Amino acid sequence: MTVVNKSFLTFLVFFCQILFPLNASALEAPRTVKAWASVLGDNIAETWNEPQHVDLYVPAITWHARFAYDKEKTDRYNERPWGAGIGKSRWDEKGNWHGLYVMAFKDSYNKWEPIAGYGWEATWRPLPDDAFHVGLGYTLGVTARDNWDYIPIPLVLPLASVGYGPATFQMTYIPGTYNNGNVYFAWLRLQF
């Protein structure tokens, strides 16, 4: 057996042990996933049925990471995502934000792109003024694009925000490969 084959075999055995552990925690995983899905479903239902706010979404900027694109492409792309959206949101007993939203905006090709989903952010109020807040979380949703024939595409993306009172600047990053994805997208969210 060559050194490369031995190294590969060692890696394969190690990887399989990580991927397929044979212990009690592996048997608990389905229950953990079920519990997480149950909490997610409850949070979505509570946000839909008992919202504290109606939100207005105003897309502000898209930025294609210059290190991940050919200049010819970024020169042609739209980075002004005109559009609007509406949503429902609430703050839970821990002070974290939950929101349901639907938004439409002009994508990189200046075509309309709808998106709808649920967002959650752990929220901190680091200053003595409780009106100032920052958040980190995620969004689960569905979008559709003109260049993909408006086929619904599920998504899971990170969220981050900074806000004061009812105004929040919220953002995400769409990961990708060279000349695809790697887009920063941000919007203003106003709570009423």
Curated annotation (Swiss-Prot):
Hey, where's the site called Role in the phospholipid gating on this chain? Y178
Q: InterPro entries attached here?
A: LipidA_acyl_PagP, OMP/PagP_b-brl
Listed A to Z, the keywords are: Acyltransferase, Cell outer membrane, Membrane, Signal, Transferase
Q: Per its UniProt entry, which superkingdom is the organism in? A: Bacteria
Cellular location(s): Cell outer membrane
Q: Name one GO biological process term.
A: lipid A biosynthetic process
Please provide, in alphabetical order, the Gene Ontology terms of the cellular component aspect for this entry: cell outer membrane
Predominant cellular place of this UniProt entry's protein: membrane
Cite the EC number: 2.3.1.251
What is the annotated signal peptide range for this record?
Answer: 1-26
Q: Name one Pfam family in it.
A: PagP
Assembly description: Homodimer.
The text of the family note is: Belongs to the lipid A palmitoyltransferase family.
Per the entry, what this protein does is: Transfers a fatty acid residue from the sn-1 position of a phospholipid to the N-linked hydroxyfatty acid chain on the proximal unit of lipid A or its precursors.
Q: What is this protein called?
A: Lipid A acyltransferase PagP
Give the species this sequence originates from. Answer: Cronobacter turicensis (strain DSM 18703 / CCUG 55852 / LMG 23827 / z3032)
- As recorded in Swiss-Prot or TrEMBL, the protein's gene is named pagP
